[in-house]
């Protein structure tokens, strides 16, 4: 029973860590002007623009 609890805690820790860092950086490595806005919208952001050769996604809000 104690082994199952340890495994569950380890899996929970890994899941939370992966989920936290999955959207850590919302900038793509190279910006393609035609697809930047589409890619950002597909990921759940309001819009996207190419800034300094990087696709910057803008969230909903102000």
UniProtKB/Swiss-Prot annotation:
Site for Basic residue of the functional dyad, important for the interaction with Kv1.2/KCNA2 channel, residues: 49
Domain of life: Eukaryota
Disulfide feature: 31-50, 36-55, 40-57
Organism: Centruroides noxius (Mexican scorpion)
UniProtKB keywords: Amidation, Calcium-activated potassium channel impairing toxin, Disulfide bond, Ion channel impairing toxin, Neurotoxin, Potassium channel impairing toxin, Secreted, Signal, Toxin, Voltage-gated potassium channel impairing toxin
Comment, domains: Has the structural arrangement of an alpha-helix connected to a beta-sheet by disulfide bonds (CSalpha/beta).
InterPro entries: Scorpion_toxin-like_sf
Propeptide feature: residues: 23-28
Molecular function as annotated in GO: potassium channel regulator activity; toxin activity
Protein name: Potassium channel toxin alpha-KTx 10.1
Residues modified as Tyrosine amide: 60
Tissue distribution of the protein: Expressed by the venom gland.
Main location: secreted
Site (Important for the interaction with Kv1.2/KCNA2 channel): residue numbering on this chain: 34, 38, 42, 46, 51-52, 56
Signal peptide (residue range): 1-22
Gene3D superfamilies: Knottin, scorpion toxin-like (3.30.30.10)
Site (Aromatic residue of the functional dyad, important for the interaction with Kv1.2/KCNA2 channel): 58
Function: Blocks Shaker B (Sh) and voltage-gated potassium-channels Kv1.1/KCNA1, Kv1.2/KCNA2, Kv1.3/KCNA3. Also inhibits small conductance calcium-activated potassium channels (KCNN) and intermediate conductance calcium-activated potassium channel (KCa3.1/KCNN4).
GO annotation, cellular component aspect: extracellular region
Cellular localization per UniProt: Secreted
Lineage: Eukaryota, Metazoa, Ecdysozoa, Arthropoda, Chelicerata
Leftover remarks: Negative results: does not inhibit Kv1.5/KCNA5 and Kv3.1/KCNC1.
Family affiliation: Belongs to the short scorpion toxin superfamily. Potassium channel inhibitor family. Alpha-KTx 10 subfamily.
């Amino acid at each position: 029973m104690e082994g199952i609890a340890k495994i569950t805690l380890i899996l929970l820790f890994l899941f939370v860590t992966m989920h936290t860092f999955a959207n850590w950086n919302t900038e793509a490595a190279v910006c393609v002007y035609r697809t930047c806005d589409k890619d950002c919208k597909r990921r759940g952001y309001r819009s996207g623009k190419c800034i300094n050769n990087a696709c910057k996604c803008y969230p909903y809000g102000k």
